[in-house]
Amino acid sequence: MSGIENSGADAGEGRVKNAILIAGPTASGKSALALDLAERAGGVIVNSDSMQGYSVLDVLTARPEAADLARVPHFLYGHVHPGTAYSTGAWLRDVMKLIDDGMLSRRPVFVGGTGLYFRALAEGISEMPDIPPRIRDRWRYELKEQGAVKLHGLLLREDSRAAMQLKPTDSQRIVRALEVLDASGRSILEWQAERGRPLIDRQTARFLVIEPDRAALVDRIERRFDQMLDKGALEEVRQLAALGLDPDLPAMKAIGVRDLQAAMAGQLSFPEAIERAKIATRQYAKRQATWFRHQLGPEWQRLRPGDDLETTMQTLVANAT
């Protein structure tokens, strides 16, 4: 069965039918579950995690390994240079290209931990203007020179409504608002009000969010980071450092990068850097779980400790036909 519906706009023309969405905090086992599900359903896997899209960071972002990639087709993993500020809109455009190219004709399983990706997929997203490199570079330079608080003051004068919705220290969103205003002459709020169409057919889609036991998750996080070190995480950090990238880029903020860089520079001991990275991972997982708990709607099935995983899998496969 085709993954694209062609029965008319009212029925969701051009949207992916029978999509399966799997969300969960980092280290919750969602990638393994998605792989099993994709094999059973004869489907493909689409990365829905903002960090796993970056190249170089194979190990530190826990991307699927070669053996898993060989089992079913995987898309949107490691395809973005770490020097790029990859956005939700860019990810959605990449998904649209997969659809246009017929790559999602088999049942797609979207899996990841980036809640905004799932929201954009199911609800649509505002189309933002393209930002010319000269404008992007200008505002990155201004951020370095002036700092977030001063740029927030500038935004307050130029676009007070947008500025009032942002914390003065939220450098990434402040710069984004200034870039959009500079490139288009319109407030980012105006662009955000123009929401696009969803890319999936919600009526046939199936939604699953993993809610793991907290203690078990902490244990998995601890063990997984140790395994990352054994698999070459330090070499990835060296490769990333060799690129000489802006430290404010999203890829440079991947968990473990700054701590391990500090240890390699002699600013921290390696045990201290490792412990900091593990703590940051636990905190990130907690934020993800909180977001999923409060932001995902009733259509999302919750997979909790003690639930029958096999029954859940069978239901998802049976319903997605």
From Swiss-Prot:
ATP binds at G24, P25, T26, A27, S28, G29, K30, S31. Residues 49-52, 172-176 are annotated as: Interaction with substrate tRNA. CDD domains: NK. Substrate binds at T26, A27, S28, G29, K30, S31. The record marks T114, R136 as: Interaction with substrate tRNA. GO terms for molecular function: ATP binding; tRNA dimethylallyltransferase activity. Transmembrane segments: none annotated. It catalyses: adenosine(37) in tRNA + dimethylallyl diphosphate = N(6)-dimethylallyladenosine(37) in tRNA + diphosphate. Its EC number is 2.5.1.75. InterPro entries: Dimethylallyltransferase, IPT, P-loop_NTPase. Catalyzes the transfer of a dimethylallyl group onto the adenine at position 37 in tRNAs that read codons beginning with uridine, leading to the formation of N6-(dimethylallyl)adenosine (i(6)A). Belongs to the IPP transferase family. Monomer. This is tRNA dimethylallyltransferase.
